[in-house]
Amino acid sequence: MRMRLMLLGGGNALGQALLRQGAEENIEFLAPMPPEQGWDPASLTALLDEQRPDALVNLAYYHDWFQARQVEAERLFAQEHAIDRLAELCLHHEIILLQPSSYKVFDGARATAYSEKDEVRPLSLRAQALWRFEQQVRTICPRHVLLRFGWLLDESPGGRMDRLLQWAESGEPLYLADDRRGNPTPVDDAARVILSVLKQLDCNAPLWGTYHYGGIEAATSLAMGQATLIEARRHRAEIPQDFTPQAHIERPDAPEEPQHAVLSCKKILNTFGIKPRAWRATLPAIIDRYYRHH
């Protein structure tokens, strides 16, 4: 790797997976510790004026964007200011900016897979913010890659998987939608994709733009939950019961969560040669890490 790489957010689950996989291939990232209050315009300016990497992976707000149950509007507003400044700095210092986004920018009203050309219609406050973050990067920093991921799965406390497993161990009745579909995407796989993109950008390939990636095969949230419990019982045999099917419309998060969230991954395959991997193959490693830390 000729490019000097910087990673914001090396402490979260996706950042850790990226650092692990990079180390296996002797690819190093500058991974600065965030200030106590998190990255803001002033601290980003000081950092990039001094360091000036060739490419920057922005995972600074990963937990808020992809794992937290709720995010306060004030936090998203502050992040918007930070991303605006980050994009300006990347333009000024000629830094490639790679930033994740989400299936959540779509409303989930259509049953077929979403491509990068499909109309965006975010449902929730967080999804609307993610769309604005995308637009900031597109408008300000031409040398960018935006990666929209499917249902990101990791072992982090307070994340999607953690909530699911704590619920399963609580003994309460368990319900998941059997008519809500998406692409479960373990963080190990998402990290592989980010690394693959960086390697090709290192060869001076100007492949800027927006790309979709999700694990195969697409699944209902019920099927994903059941697969998770099968793996979890290898560590906690006493997990009492299985999930009961429920309609998407009856789920408490239905107003905010797209019912149909399957992403078409043809563009990333055709452009970068990145093939989707089976999420079920990587799920055991995440569950294993989860129970090692709990």
PLM-predicted stretches and their roles:
Residues 3-24:
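N-terminal Rossmann NAD(P)H-binding glycine-rich loop of SDR-like oxidoreductase domains
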Residues 8, 59, 97-103, 147-149:
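SDR active-site strand-loop-helix element
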Residues 36-82, 89:
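NAD(P)H-binding glycine-rich loop region in Rossmannoid oxidoreductase-like domains
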Residues 76, 112-134, 154, 184-185, ...:
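Short-chain dehydrogenase/reductase
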Residues 84-121:
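Conserved Rossmann-fold NAD(P)-dependent oxidoreductase catalytic core, especially the SDR/UDP-sugar
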Residues 135-182, 187-189, 195-196:
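NAD(P)-dependent short-chain dehydrogenase/reductase
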Residues 193, 200-253:
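Mid/C-terminal beta-alpha module of Rossmann-like enzyme folds, strongest
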Residues 277-294:
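Amphipathic terminal alpha-helices
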